[in-house]
From Swiss-Prot:
Pfam families: Nitroreductase
Protein family per UniProt: Belongs to the nitroreductase family. HadB/RutE subfamily.
InterPro entries in the cross-refs: Nitroreductase (IPR029479), Nitroreductase-like (IPR000415), Nitroreductase_HadB/RutE (IPR050461), RutE-like (IPR023936)
Annotated S-S bridges: none
Top-tier EC class: oxidoreductase
CDD domains in UniProt: RutE-like (cd02148)
Species of origin: Streptomyces griseus subsp. griseus (strain JCM 4626 / CBS 651.72 / NBRC 13350 / KCC S-0626 / ISP 5235)
Gene3D superfamilies assigned: NADH Oxidase
Record EC number: 1.-.-.-
This protein's name: Putative NADH dehydrogenase/NAD(P)H nitroreductase SGR_2476
Entry cofactors: FMN
One GO molecular-function entry: oxidoreductase activity
Keywords: Flavoprotein, FMN, NAD, NADP, Oxidoreductase
Length: 196
């Protein structure tokens, strides 16, 4: 069976896309980032929570502050990527629910009045949105280098607040020389899918 999405687009988004480890010097513009967001914001989340928040680290001072919280192996590529984004979950996302879920505004208090419930929901749904974000970066013809090797408490203190939990740091740009590691294997259909 063939998919509706053009094979070239399938390759761009999935089969040929890889995590980039080096980048060219070509800048990533605010217009590109807005185009990415304006596409991926339509990806589904439970109750339309939309808890993902993004901090773009553009300044040299901000980059220096960020690099010190990255794992040693992630520091050089984070220091040199054209753009770095900190993706975080907003644990107070429920405050936006009356606007985001106008047909069911009572969901804010009915389901999300307790902080632990919000943190769990925000983490799950922001991670889902982070995946959309990576696909959106690829759709813009750019490469993404998502990383979870960092001091989460340090990044939270430096760039966020107690209501925002860092999920990942993503380097963004045009891939540079030797950007890719060899493609790692994937599990087969039969290893993943069961039918009952």
């Amino acid at each position: 069976m063939s998919l509706v999405l053009d094979p070239a687009a399938q390759d761009l988004l999935f089969r040929e896309a890889r995590t980039a480890n080096t980048f060219t010097d070509e800048p990533v513009t605010d217009e590109q980032v807005q185009a990415i967001y304006d596409l991926v914001k339509f990806g589904p989340t439970a109750f339309n929570q939309s808890p993902l928040r993004v901090v773009l680290v553009r300044s040299a001072e901000g980059r220096e502050r960020l690099v010190q919280h990255m794992a040693e192996g992630n520091r050089p590529k984070t220091a040199t990527a054209p753009l770095v984004a900190i993706l975080a979950a907003d644990n107070e996302f429920h405050e936006e629910l009356p606007a985001l879920l106008p047909h069911f505004p009572q969901a804010k208090d009915l389901f999300f009045s307790e902080r632990p419930v919000r943190e769990s929901a925000a983490g799950l749904n922001a991670a889902l949105q982070a995946a959309y974000f990576i696909i959106g970066v690829r759709a813009a013809g750019l490469a993404a280098g998502p990383m979870t090797g960092y001091d989460a408490a340090g990044i939270q203190k430096e760039f966020l607040d107690d209501d925002h939990t860092p999920l990942m740091v993503v380097n963004i740009g045009k891939p540079g020389d030797d950007a890719w590691f060899p493609r790692s294997p994937r599990l087969s259909f039969d290893e993943v899918i069961t039918t009952v």
